[in-house]
UniProtKB/Swiss-Prot annotation:
Catalyzes the 2'-O-methylation at nucleotide C2498 in 23S rRNA. This is Ribosomal RNA large subunit methyltransferase M. The gene is rlmM. Transmembrane segments: none annotated. Monomer. Keywords: Cytoplasm, Methyltransferase, rRNA processing, S-adenosyl-L-methionine, Transferase. Belongs to the class I-like SAM-binding methyltransferase superfamily. RNA methyltransferase RlmE family. RlmM subfamily.
């Protein structure tokens, strides 16, 4: 199997294609991407027969920025007979995957696919029963086995394949289902909440998003991101010339500092989190983030990089490479991840976690 399907935000197919082509080549997997504008997905086709399997096994899904999901597929099933769509799908999956732990019948995230989504929901139950009977699925859901994907691109027209549960998005269609909290000051709050779900394993939340931590929000007004930190009982310094929502100030957990986020320097050395969602050139934001990390002013950071109109993948890659180079130069070991989240628009969200510094005596090590 030489094809891989990647879901992405509609309008960002070219970026997703450029990224998978680049990162596949680093694994010595060569091929080409099929791109249809505003379709919400990309198909990468390798030149060697087992290239698809190699990518979903060896290319870390967490290293992809523009992909929401990644799975290997066989040939496109066309013109499924309306009276029996199940038999051809079961036949295609037999021999491709054994004892999958979960079934996801999905569509791309487009307006055109909304009607098709209703069909997928109804179709899932009888298809799951048939796949269990055929041995393609286990008799119970388990996260330890591969996920079986059936991806409809049109009525009666689908790709079938699988992903590995330790190297995929755990979410249906690659989208976390989050509800906007009615008391949050702005919808941007969902970006940070989604970032926590994507970048921080659920079993580490109690330790890394803990009560009583100190956090800084640069460019905080009106407080959408501060809201998420307050909700987790952190003490937050919100830095912005613009006013904060009164509901946040009333909690007593927020200190509003009326100054420019680029000029602010912290006066304490135990800041666990710095978050930043400022509308500014990505290179300028990347330089500021690198400064915070190199100086040990925070342990972890989540920030947004606004994307230019063209060469978006190249721009983000340069920004991340700059941050990595600064960390390397100063002997700081860190994990860097970036993803265009479902709640992001013309931007990507980056998470950096300092692990240790080669040189002792930084502010966060005293």
């Amino acid at each position: 199997m030489n094809k891989v399907v990647l879901y992405c935000r509609p309008g960002f197919e070219k970026e997703c294609a450029a990224e998978i082509t680049d990162k596949a080549a680093r694994l010595e997997v060569f091929g080409f991407a099929r791109v249809k504008e505003d379709s919400g997905y990309v198909i990468f086709e390798g030149y060697q027969q087992d290239d698809g399997e190699k990518l979903v096994r060896d290319l870390p899904f967490s290293s992809l920025i523009f992909a929401r999901q990644m799975f290997v597929v066989g040939e496109l099933l066309r013109d499924l007979p309306p009276e029996d769509r199940i038999t051809p799908i079961v036949g295609m999956l037999q021999g491709m995957v054994e004892k999958g732990g979960e079934l996801r019948v999905e569509v791309a995230d487009t307006n055109e696919s909304k009607e098709l989504m209703k069909f997928c929901r109804k179709f899932t139950v009888p298809l799951r029963a048939a796949l269990r009977e055929a041995g393609v699925l286990t008799n119970y859901e388990t996260p330890k086995r591969p996920v079986v994907h059936v991806f409809f691109i049109a009525p009666g027209c689908c790709y079938t394949g699988y992903s590995y549960s330790n190297n995929n998005s755990p979410f249906y269609m690659g989208i976390p289902r989050l509800k906007f909290p009615s008391d949050a000051p702005s919808r941007s709050t969902l970006k940070l909440e989604e970032a926590f779900h994507v970048f921080i394993p659920a079993d580490e939340w109690d330790e890394r998003l803990a009560n009583g931590m100190y956090a800084v929000d640069l460019g905080a007004c009106p407080g959408g991101w501060t809201y998420q930190l307050v909700k987790r009982n952190m003490w937050v310094s919100s830095v912005d010339n613009g006013p904060m929502a009164q509901s946040l100030m009333d909690t007593g957990q927020v200190t509003w500092l009326r100054e420019d986020g680029f000029r602010y320097r912290p006066n304490r050395n135990n800041i666990s989190w710095m978050v930043c969602d400022m509308v500014e050139k990505p290179a300028k934001v990347a330089a500021l983030m690198a400064q915070w990390l190199v100086n040990g002013w925070c342990r972890e950071t989540i920030f947004n990089l606004k994307l230019p109109m063209k060469k978006r993948y190249e721009e983000v890659s340069q920004n991340l490479a700059y941050i990595q180079a600064q960390l390397d130069e100063h002997g700081v070991n860190a994990q860097i991840q970036a993803r265009q989240l479902y709640h992001d628009r013309e931007e990507v969200t980056v998470h950096v976690r300092r692990l240790w510094a080669a040189v002792g005596g930084r502010r966060d090590e005293r």
